Amino acid sequence: MSTDQPAVGSIFDLYKIGAGPSSSHSIGTERAARRFLARQPTPPASVRVTLFGSLAATGRGHLTDQGIRRALDGIPVEIVWDTDAGNLKHPNTIRFDALGVGGRATNSWTVYSIGGGNLRDDSGPVGDDEPARYSHRTVTELLALCEAQGLSFWQLVEKTERAPWPRLETIWEAMEASVRRGLDSRENFLPGPLKLARKARTTLLRGRDLASPQRDLALLAAFALAVSEENAAGGTIVTAPSCGAAGVLPGMLYYYHTVKGLPRRDILEALATAGLFGSVIRANASISGAEVGCQGEVGSACSMAAAAGAQLLGGTLRQIEYAAEIGMEHHLGLTCDPIEGYVQIPCIERNMTACLRAAECAVFALLTDGRHLVSFDDVIDVMYRTGADLQSAYRETARGGLAELWRRRMSGQSKAGAATAAPAEHHSYCD
């Protein structure tokens, strides 16, 4: 397991409000650029930014360069895309060089965008990350603590975090707003060369006319799609635990709040519990697709949403843990292979299916007494080891899987000419 943190950190390290489409490639890199500029005693004549590994491989589709230029506030920027992943301490590595008038480097900084918008350099965590607050590192230990003290998971969060409820209110309001914007959007297509059609609004409108349980599935799908499409369009979302997986948890919570009518306080408590499970994953493994594949992003989001759903259904501590375990276990090995580097295919529909799976995990866990053979912590350990074993082509480099399939298809089309191009519906909906 990862040993970067001595214990589980604050849930507010996990939930960050920012612009998509990627927490590591967009939010993290923009934060790094702002921090680098703030470190300079005087504004440099120009800045050279070298993006390594995954940041170079998929950064254009993730709008990495745009965020960096925005953060450097008009200073001339040279961006170098170095896709060589050899000997990197982290696949999302950035080097900033402040340049004088003659082009000579006056100051340099190497930093790593480790997922969820968080940063680390060779001295440790960077920025406004809150210190580790929880006394234990695993859910097994936290569960035992809650049982001994008669606490629920959300009460442990309340007891441990600094003024959590107003902050969770802000996070939930941002999540709600992202769902509503996605549902209300009249844009037919998402930005980028794929011309991928938005589906959230039509899914909502068609789903309302169905009878349950199909209606419930359609609404869950619409809510998750809405956030994911907003993220893909560069809209403001909440990392949960990342931008690429930002639709799963809000989709679940929005459903229980607006369709099932659960009060806002219940939603905030579920958000607290989900954040605790996500923080355990971050402390013991990774939430970065570039490091462990999409199992660390959508798999983690499904696990968090399953825990939240089980709590909202009235589950016990052990049933909540079981739901979270199922959510992650059945995403093990999930690759990160975005077509053209855009957080669209397979990312958007993957958020939708993970939201549906999370709802199923929560329901099933409550049909049991919560006892099971493989613990949540065991699965997180396996997830991290599996991610380390994944070939780099399947860890957000757009060199394998669906990305490679698409590249070969487009290459064949360019050679054969427009007459042999794939049908338009394949171009828009291939997943």
Protein language model regions, located:
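Alpha-helical support elements that line or immediately flank enzyme active sites
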Residues: 26-39, 250-261, 306-314
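C-terminal regulatory domains involved in ligand/effector binding and gene-expression control
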Residues: 74-209, 219
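Short alpha-helical scaffolding segments that buttress acidic/His motifs in well-ordered protein cores
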Residues: 14, 18, 220-228, 270-278, ...
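Accessory "access/gating" subregions that flank catalytic or transport cores
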Residues: 166, 176-289, 293, 401-431
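Conserved phosphate/anionic-ligand binding catalytic regions in large, soluble enzymes, centered on
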Residues: 15-33, 233-252, 294-302
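Functionally critical mobile loop/hinge segments
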Residues: 309-431
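A structural-propensity feature for long, helix-poor, extended segments
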Residues: 46-82, 269-313, 317-323, 329-361
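Non-transmembrane, aqueous-exposed alpha-helical and coiled segments at domain scale
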Residues: 2-7, 12-16, 30-55, 61, ...
